[in-house]
A protein has these predicted regions:
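An anionic, glycine-rich sequence signature occurring as long contiguous blocks
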Residues: 83-183, 271-275
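Active-site-proximal, Lys/Arg-enriched surface segment
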Residues: 1-16
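Short, surface-exposed basic-aromatic patches at helix termini and helix-loop junctions that form
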Residues: 74-83
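A short, flexible helix-boundary coil/loop motif
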Residues: 211-275
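Short amphipathic alpha-helical "interface-anchor" segments enriched in bulky aromatics
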Residues: 159-200, 204, 208-216
């Protein structure tokens, strides 16, 4: 489908990760258009049904960009009793509501000649929302330029600053997960003619993500490599010459005696075998 913003035909896949560990929950291929509320809830409902069945006492927080900020998703989260904190697209009404705080931030920045970041919260109801929701507003002046940000959430027992900086901004880690998946594993290679074929390719890339993530987080546990990206792991550890011997019950890999990461490889194999 043609996407006017990107000025080309493209897909816009959905990536869902566990926000602390980076474990992949699911990836689904989508047409290149903005996600509708019913589409988002159909995906999230299947995930939440499974999570709440397996871990009924686990507290779940949905964190995402503004594509997920729809009344259907808000109602879904409230229905499941889970927290949500989602980016909210800026519009003229939100901009007007945040203007007094932005003017204060601009005045403070002019006085101190330093970047200023202020926070506030207020109730807001878009035309498509059946009821108002809490908006967290960040008014920031950096290098003389305004940088407003809005977030919608149902979490009320935290300060606006904490909600934005400690909870919402932590979604930046998910960008690293997506980069590992899309860039380093090249999961954006969707050049097949059929949609189903491209979805299958995405599943294969997702399987590769799970494999490398397991090596990174379990195999490399206790080493400095747990924070390395997938590109570094592939180039330095895996893309090396080796002799492969297939036997009746096992496959043996013979590395060169000068292989520089022998100790790391032993650690990875030991950790994977004992986990």
């Amino acid at each position: 489908m043609f996407h006017a913003y990107y000025d080309e035909y493209c897909y816009l896949p959905v990536h869902l990760y566990e926000g602390e560990s980076g474990k992949l929950i699911t990836t689904l291929l989508r047409p290149g258009r903005r996600m509708r509320g019913r589409e988002a809830t159909a995906i999230l409902k299947r995930v939440l049904d499974h999570l709440t069945m397996v871990w009924p006492k686990t507290k779940i927080t949905l964190r995402g960009d503004s594509h997920f900020s729809t009344p259907e998703v808000h109602d879904l989260c409230d229905g499941y009793g889970i927290d949500f904190i989602l980016g909210q697209a800026i519009n003229s009404k939100l901009k007007a509501l945040g203007e007094p705080l932005m003017e204060l931030a601009a005045a403070l920045a002019e006085q101190t000649d330093e970047p200023v970041r202020l926070f506030d919260r207020f109730e807001y109801q878009a035309k498509s929302w059946p009821r108002p929701h809490q908006i967290i507003y960040k008014a920031e002046i950096t290098k003389g330029k305004a940088n407003p940000r809005f977030v919608v959430t149902n979490i009320r027992n935290r300060t606006p600053e904490f909600l934005y900086e400690k909870i919402y901004c932590a979604r930046g880690r998910s960008e690293g997960f997506i980069k590992n998946h899309k860039t380093y594993l090249q999961s954006d290679r969707t050049s097949c003619h059929r949609f189903s074929a491209n979805q299958f390719r995405l599943f294969l890339h997702s399987a590769a993500y799970v494999l490398l993530h397991t090596i990174q987080q379990i195999g490399m546990r206790g080493t400095q490599w747990t924070t390395s990206n997938f590109d570094t792991i592939q180039r330095r550890m895996l893309k090396v010459g080796a002799r492969v011997r297939e036997q009746a019950t096992k496959v043996r890999f013979h590395f060169s005696t000068s292989y520089p990461l022998k100790d790391l490889m032993r650690t990875v194999v030991f950790n994977l075998n004992t986990s």
